[in-house]
């Protein structure tokens, strides 16, 4: 482990923008190094105190759906090179699972999620802030493909959710958070030039921290 605090990279962007592809590309490049991925999706609020009919109304694209207090606490622990117990969210029960995942601290932390740039407290902890910017038509097509294939959703339900929830929340919260990004990556995981530049920048920051 390094003697300096870890490097934190925030990667935000709308659903289906290619955040995960960008995250994986960066992670794969540093494979074998001390690096971890922390997904904001794991930090939805515990709703075990609510009846199921209330849980079903959860808007997962709204900032208030996330337990950022716990996420920030865990980030501070990782920055101090302390282990955390990452929560697990059960989407079938619409609440937090009793299961936790032990996460060892690493020298590079990739924080990925639709709204990681929306909370100034999270932004303050980041060394590099990225926003993956992809055309809305492509994002809905990717989301449709994912939800139908992986989550057993119907096309009608995906479209209805997109029109009533995903698009309004994107326009209200996700898109405005783009202004806090240091770097905007168009075309998501297909933008190999931008990813290569990011990899070089991260390597430079790591080298600077080692030489301090």
UniProtKB/Swiss-Prot annotation:
Pathway: Pyrimidine metabolism; CTP biosynthesis via salvage pathway; CTP from cytidine: step 1/3; Pyrimidine metabolism; UMP biosynthesis via salvage pathway; UMP from uridine: step 1/1. The keyword Hydrolase does not apply. ATP binds at residues 13-20. Signal peptide: none annotated. SUPFAM superfamilies: P-loop containing nucleoside triphosphate hydrolases (SSF52540). Its EC number is 2.7.1.48. This is Uridine kinase. The gene is udk.
């Amino acid at each position: 482990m390094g003697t300096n605090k870890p490097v934190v990279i925030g990667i935000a962007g709308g659903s289906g923008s290619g955040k995960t592809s960008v995250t994986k590309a960066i992670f794969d490049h540093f494979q074998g190094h001390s690096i971890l991925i922390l997904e904001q999706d794991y930090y939805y609020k515990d709703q075990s105190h609510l009846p199921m009919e209330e849980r079903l109304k959860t808007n997962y694209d709204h900032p208030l759906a996330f337990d950022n207090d716990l996420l920030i606490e865990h980030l501070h622990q990782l920055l101090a090179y302390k282990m955390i117990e990452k929560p697990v969210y059960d989407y079938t029960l619409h609440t937090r699972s009793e299961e936790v995942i032990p996460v060892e601290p690493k020298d590079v932390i990739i924080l990925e999620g639709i709204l990681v740039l929306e909370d100034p407290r999270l932004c303050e902890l980041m060394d590099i802030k990225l926003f993956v910017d992809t055309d809305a038509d492509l994002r809905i097509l990717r989301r449709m493909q994912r939800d139908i294939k992986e989550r057993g959703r119907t096309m009608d339900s995906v479209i209805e959710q997109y029109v009533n929830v995903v698009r309004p929340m994107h326009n209200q919260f996700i898109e405005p958070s783009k202004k806090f990004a240091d770097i905007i990556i168009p075309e998501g995981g297909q933008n190999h030039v931008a990813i290569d530049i990011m990899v070089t920048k991260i390597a430079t920051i790591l080298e600077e921290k080692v030489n301090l």
